[in-house]
Amino acid sequence: MLPSAQVARLKPDPFPPSLSPIPHGAVTFAALAPCHNLPIFSSRQMLRDSLTYSHTSPTMSPQIANRFEASLDAQDIARISLFTLESGVILRDVPVAYKSWGRMNVSRDNCVIVCHTLTSSAHVTSWWPTLFGQGRAFDTSRYFIICLNYLGSPFGSAGPCSPDPDAEGQRPYGAKFPRTTIRDDVRIHRQVLDRLGVRQIAAVVGASMGGMHTLEWAFFGPEYVRKIVPIATSCRQSGWCAAWFETQRQCIYDDPKYLDGEYDVDDQPVRGLETARKIANLTYKSKPAMDERFHMAPGVQAGRNISSQDAKKEINGTDSGNSHRAGQPIEAVSSYLRYQAQKFAASFDANCYIAMTLKFDTHDISRGRAGSIPEALAMITQPALIICARSDGLYSFDEHVEMGRSIPNSRLCVVDTNEGHDFFVMEADKVNDAVRGFLDQSLM
């Protein structure tokens, strides 16, 4: 076990016995020692980067801007008249989509923010349903749950698919939509919460890209955000992840139908977007998870002999869509990747994918705040539950350990799984138990 500093600050451990730190358990918890001898920052310094914006009042609008948003169930849209991005670019008439569940209490301090992933929408119940319901982490009888959509997404907030108010006929921004940052998202989302009358955030929970947003929310200070749960994430975009995303973007750029981003929204560069998604899906899994899924674990015969019919086929992949036989693991891999890619490409916009992946590259919680990541993490004083998996190939176990050691009042939760980065979805029951216990611990 790692050092148990800071545990005394929290109430007795509420986690169910099944989540106790046992050698072969599903989940392991450890309190991590804080960093010492770090400079002290005032609250004004902590919030300076996040609060330099004008408070404009959003208004509610039912407008649906594109077919991707139209595919969703009903959601709310807040509109902010002017918003200045970190880059200095000013956006006008900015829509921000959000979905909420439950009710605010009288003191308006029972709000739980759920930060979505790269390609998800604000409809959390469609992609994280296990965490919703009475007695679960997101208990709508206790909390006002809200998820706000990010800038650059095709699912309701301002992005490449939304109308440009300064363009002739208000045609969509397309590739002209300016680059945005995770801090931009958090700042504009706070404006929406202010308009809704939220006085204090009980907790912020997010995985992957949502975990990055979760960390940024913490810098509003403990008086506003009481606790955080970053999951499968990082404090700064790594070269490893940046390379994966750049490779995916190049697949889209190289599609002849991309047309420098000036394609018709109903005539997407589908081939490039599908290939990008295939690559992304590989980063979400681990080798053991893929081997197990497709019966390629050690000792299992996965290959097969090449038949005379196969030998006549070209190797350019153009006819591979009809060449798969049930029960053949190699073909099953191809079929799985192709199915997932086609499903995704039919529901997402290429320019939005580029905009959203570029947003990752801006992520660095120390930027403008501190001289190093540990120094920036030490400024987060809220209780924090950090959830990770050793099998995550995108955001490493070591990154989460550093996060835990540097946040003074933190606990590390290690989910025992081979699922890779996708563990927070594939092992949602374990994540639910951990988050629920942590929320109960300090919010009851």
From Swiss-Prot:
Sequence ranges assigned to domain AB hydrolase-1 in this UniProt record: 112-425
Pathway(s) per entry: Antibiotic biosynthesis; cephalosporin C biosynthesis
One BP annotation, GO: methionine biosynthetic process
One GO molecular-function entry: deacetylcephalosporin-C acetyltransferase activity
EC number: 2.3.1.175
Keywords, sorted A to Z: Acyltransferase, Antibiotic biosynthesis, Transferase
Propeptide, residue positions: 1-71
PANTHER family: HOMOSERINE O-ACETYLTRANSFERASE
Name this polypeptide is given: Acetyl-CoA--deacetylcephalosporin C acetyltransferase
Parts of the chain that traverse the membrane: none
Family, as annotated: Belongs to the AB hydrolase superfamily. MetX family.
Enzyme class: transferase
Function: Catalyzes the conversion of deacetylcephalosporin C to cephalosporin C.
Organism: Hapsidospora chrysogena (Acremonium chrysogenum)
Oligomeric form and interacting partners: Heterodimer of chain I and chain II.
Catalysis: reaction(s): deacetylcephalosporin C + acetyl-CoA = cephalosporin C + CoA
Gene coding for it: CEFG
Active site: S208, H421
HAMAP family to which the protein is assigned, alphabetical: MetX_acyltransf (MF_00296)
